[in-house]
């Protein structure tokens, strides 16, 4: 009698040792009280950050900034993993110490951004597809050798109810691309972080965002199953359910918490170890408070934590200003924000970390990472 997997013509299973390694890494990334530092800004994106503090975008300055982040003593108490840009994975600081080693010193797992950016989907109104599947398997092998143990692939969708966005074509393209990426990563021992980001652009209500997010996540997990992705060895990086940035209707952090949790419960299998939210242009304080509201509704079948870039780094950059004499203070600010988000993963954040500057909006229209 044929086995069920043979009858169903199911995708080939991962070797047991690979599956075990992936599941172990995924669990470590979402261990209690910790989240992920997204420091994988492209060279073009980091230029925008440096322009804001009037700092030249040189390889030396980029290395100095990464050294500031990864050399922060005690960061590993709140941060489990760090997503790196390819340059950073192979980079050393001024003292000749590899950035990966700085992370290892804090028991932080190195990860790598593997997508190659966005292009327009033909026959759509500028909806986006993510590039990077060609040659991904070979790159994953090199990244693993260099010390990376997980990867990230970002897709974006836009809500525009008047134009019927996101279209079914866009959602399918997003889901299938994420699933192919995830499968390739797992075949090469990297835990895939699956990131279907629905941008906050536009005037749509929080209820519309909930409906669209539910549809997108449903399609993503269907595609993951069809591609044989081991859910126990993967993580999801979604947007929180929020109103569009131009929406005039008032919403509360409790609204964000309730609708985000409801959406996840309707779509995300409990086999997945965890969900690591993106901040999506929320202020540092909003990102912490909303994460707190989400976790206050627990217990949940998955860990619900953070994978923040701007919401962990904005005040750090403003404090640093590219000056060596500001490094120690900037590291204090990083620890303060990381601890705030750690508390939020327990639903115990009371607010107020970072003062007034933490409340500044970090929203960028049509955000490119």
From Swiss-Prot:
EC primary class: lyase
Phenotype for residue 49 to D/G: Abolishes binding to TRAP
Impact reported for residue 310 to S: Severe reduction in the binding to TRAP
Cellular localisation: Cytoplasm; Membrane; Host cell membrane
Alphabetic keyword roster: Actin-binding, Cytoplasm, Glycolysis, Host cell membrane, Host membrane, Lyase, Membrane, Schiff base
Membrane topology: Peripheral membrane protein
EC number annotated for this UniProt entry: 4.1.2.13
Role: Plays a key role in glycolysis by catalyzing the cleavage of fructose 1,6-bisphosphate into dihydroxyacetone phosphate and glyceraldehyde 3-phosphate.
Name recorded for this polypeptide: Fructose-bisphosphate aldolase
């Amino acid at each position: 009698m044929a086995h069920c997997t043979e009858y169903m013509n199911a995708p080939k299973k991962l070797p047991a040792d690979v599956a075990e390694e992936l599941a172990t890494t995924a669990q470590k990334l979402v261990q209690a009280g910790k989240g992920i530092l997204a420091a994988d800004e492209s060279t073009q994106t980091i230029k925008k950050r440096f322009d804001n503090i009037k700092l030249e975008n040189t390889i030396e300055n980029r290395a100095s900034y990464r050294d500031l982040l990864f050399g922060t003593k005690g960061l590993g108490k709140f941060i489990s993993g760090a997503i790196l840009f390819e340059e950073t994975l192979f980079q050393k600081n001024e003292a000749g110490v590899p950035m990966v080693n700085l992370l290892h010193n804090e028991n932080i797992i190195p990860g790598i951004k593997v997508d190659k950016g966005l292009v327009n989907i033909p026959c759509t109104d500028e909806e986006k597809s993510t590039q990077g599947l060609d040659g991904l398997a070979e790159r994953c092998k090199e990244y693993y050798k260099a010390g990376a143990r997980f990867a990230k692939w970002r897709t974006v969708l836009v809500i525009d109810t008047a134009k019927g966005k996101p279209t079914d074509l866009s959602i399918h393209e997003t889901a299938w691309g994420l699933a192919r990426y995830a499968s390739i990563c797992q075949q090469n021992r990297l835990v895939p972080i699956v990131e279907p980001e629905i941008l906050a652009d536009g005037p749509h209500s929080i209820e519309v965002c909930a409906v669209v997010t539910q549809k997108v996540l449903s399609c993503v997990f269907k595609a993951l199953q069809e591609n044989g992705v081991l859910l126990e060895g993967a993580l999801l990086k979604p947007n929180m359910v929020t109103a569009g940035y131009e929406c005039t209707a008032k919403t509360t952090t409790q609204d964000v918490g309730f609708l985000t949790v409801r959406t996840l419960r309707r779509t995300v299998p409990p086999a997945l170890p965890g969900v690591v939210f993106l901040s999506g242009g929320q202020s540092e304080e909003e990102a912490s408070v909303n994460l707190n509201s989400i976790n206050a509704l627990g217990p949940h079948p998955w860990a619900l934590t953070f994978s923040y870039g701007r919401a962990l780094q904005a005040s750090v950059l403003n404090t640093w200003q590219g000056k060596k004499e500001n490094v120690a203070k900037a590291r204090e600010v990083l620890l303060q924000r990381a601890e705030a988000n750690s508390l939020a993963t327990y639903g115990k954040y009371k607010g107020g970390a970072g003062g007034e500057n933490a409340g500044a909006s970090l929203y960028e229209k049509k955000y490119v990472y």
